[in-house]
């Protein structure tokens, strides 16, 4: 939620309300962690986040229930250390 606030998708302190009611689920306004994040599939520390974003942008390489319809832009972000480093990658569909 803090990252969504920091990226400007919602105002500071409004992250909790922003994610309610499925807004960040696969069929929502802003799908987040469509592959489950670090709890499910990110064992290569971030690389699987990149491959997931590319697959989503290609539009035909993930299971139908996880596919974001008409995905045009993907943001991959990650933290390192004790939240002392951060990296972001913005990808776009061709």
Task: Label each region the model flagged.
Residues 1-94:
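Claisen-condensing/thiolase-fold acyl-transfer catalytic domains that form or cleave C-C bonds
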């Amino acid at each position: 939620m803090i990252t969504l606030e920091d990226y400007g998708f919602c105002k500071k302190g409004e992250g909790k309300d922003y994610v309610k009611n499925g807004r960040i689920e696969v069929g929502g306004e802003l799908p987040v962690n469509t592959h489950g994040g670090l709890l499910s599939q990110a064992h290569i520390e971030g690389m699987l986040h990149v491959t997931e974003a590319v697959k989503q942008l290609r539009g035909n390489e993930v299971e139908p229930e996880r596919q974001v319809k008409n995905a045009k832009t993907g943001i991959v972000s990650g933290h390192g250390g004790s939240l002392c480093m951060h990296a972001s990658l913005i990808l776009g569909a061709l």
